[in-house]
Amino acid sequence: MMKRYFVTAFLAAMMMMIAPSEMSAQEDNGFKKFSVEEAFEDNGFQWFRDAQLLCAGSKEKRPTAEGRSHGENAMTIGWGGIGTLWRKTALTVYVAEKRYTKEFMDNSEYFTVMTFDVKDSKVLNYMGTKSGRDGNKADALGLHSAYTANGTPYYTEATMVIECKTMYAAPFDPQGFRSDTPRQMYANFPAGIHSMYIGEVVNAWKK
């Protein structure tokens, strides 16, 4: 009986030691966890129009088609939505076919969407006009990569980080276009047609 007590106490102590370490990585970088459902204060329509940063990949670097070795890549996005789908809190993003980030989105289980302070607008401008194929954009901007307990990359300079687990991913099917708006959009769009990525919001932190 006494032996069982000590084993149980030991396991409980180990759990208490492990759990905080998973949560403290973001807290150490100045973030506090919050509930998107209860404390998302932004206008859902305006939020994406203001542009956010999408990031996917992992700490482990992998060779690219160009022979480089990158662990993650990020890009500025202005299309997206946040709401409810399949009884989950969902966040949807769109990535064009020729974007370098698409490779990382297609090979990652999770992704993050980040906001930055207005004074850091250069981050969004640079991430939206430069390609990771030409070099490490985060390094060029002096951003510091960090990783969630799921191994999802984000930057410590962000003001808010939303982590999502991809539930659905597929390119738009032109056969499904029902108006001229998307047809005209892709008639002369060099980056190619977009893919939709619907993610379940699994974590969120803000400063």
Predicted segments with their positions:
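Short intrinsically disordered, low-complexity coil segments enriched in acidic
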Residues: M1, I18-A19
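Sec/Tat signal peptide C-region and signal peptidase I cleavage site
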Residues: P20-A25
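Bacterial N-terminal signal peptides that target proteins for export
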Residues: M1-F10
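Active-site-proximal mixed secondary-structure blocks
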Residues: Q26-K207
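Bacterial N-terminal signal peptides
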Residues: A9-I18
